Amino acid sequence: MKKGLVVFFAVVLLLAGWIFGSYNGVVTANENVNGKWSQVETQLQRRSDLIPNLVNTVKGYSAHESQVFTDVANARARLAGARNVTEAAQANGELSGALSRLLAISENYPQLKANTNFIQLQDELAGTENRLAVARKDYNDAAQAYNAKIKSFPTVLVARMMGFQERSYFKADPQAQKLSLIHISEPTRLLSIS
């Protein structure tokens, strides 16, 4: 009788340890995804903060390009109002396309292309886009690891019991990727911005 009770408690303790360990592993992976998403949001905000200065600089040279300015403002507002990863990815694609059209305006205005403020803003935007690409990749890697963890047996049992859901990937809109190709005749300098 005592031996059976000891075995029973040992099995219960092992099961409880496995449940707690699995739960903590899923929580850790989920928090990693949240942290990586925060980095994406930081870079999206940094880019969004650069846009008004860039728009104002371009406006000084090409006030008649009002549709492009409106498109940039609307896309920026949609990105700020995004409620989840999917909406943010879609709004980011729209903003990238609008920014591409804004930067393409510089081809028609040699004085704008030579403006040091424009060049610096363009360099800062390029650096931010690079940091954003890294943050998106890190987020997607973390989301993939989390999703794999909550789908693998036996952790899937704990994940379902505790209500953990699959995380969305930050997918770039293929149309926006085509629009974001910018051809600038003069190479820009790269600044080290921290």
Descriptions of predicted regions:
Residues 182-194:
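Single conserved hydrophobic/aromatic residue that forms the stacking wall/gate
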Residues 1-185:
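A helix-centric hydrophobic-segment signal that preferentially recognizes long
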